[in-house]
């Protein structure tokens, strides 16, 4: 009998906002993410540094367990601008692009 393995990635929910307009997060200054999203390491991200923003947006998109997190920490215009550069797990990218096909363009 073969044993099938289920990974955490296979069962972890991917949280997606109902609309991009709901993403009303900050756009200037320093983004301070809470420790329930950033378990260790850097938790402050500078809006003046795209590498910081890419790291912060990836954390929020991958680690959020509640829609309120993506609504609070992501901004629609910033997400649209960064989307082509974001290095996301395939399942996360696919789920967001299914919900918002305009991101794939």
Question: PLM features: residue spans?
Answer:
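Long, compositionally biased intrinsically disordered regulatory segments in eukaryotic proteins
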Residues: 1-105
């Amino acid at each position: 009998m073969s044993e099938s393995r289920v990974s955490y990635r296979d069962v972890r929910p991917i949280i997606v906002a109902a609309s991009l307009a709901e993403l009303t997060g900050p756009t200037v200054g320093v983004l301070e993410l809470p420790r329930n999203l950033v378990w260790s390491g850097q938790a402050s991200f500078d809006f003046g540094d795209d590498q910081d923003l890419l790291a912060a947006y990836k954390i929020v998109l991958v680690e959020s367990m509640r829609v309120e997190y993506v609504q609070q920490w992501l901004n629609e215009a910033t997400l649209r601008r960064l989307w082509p550069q974001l290095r996301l797990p395939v399942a996360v990218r696919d789920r967001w692009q299914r919900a918002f096909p305009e991101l794939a363009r």
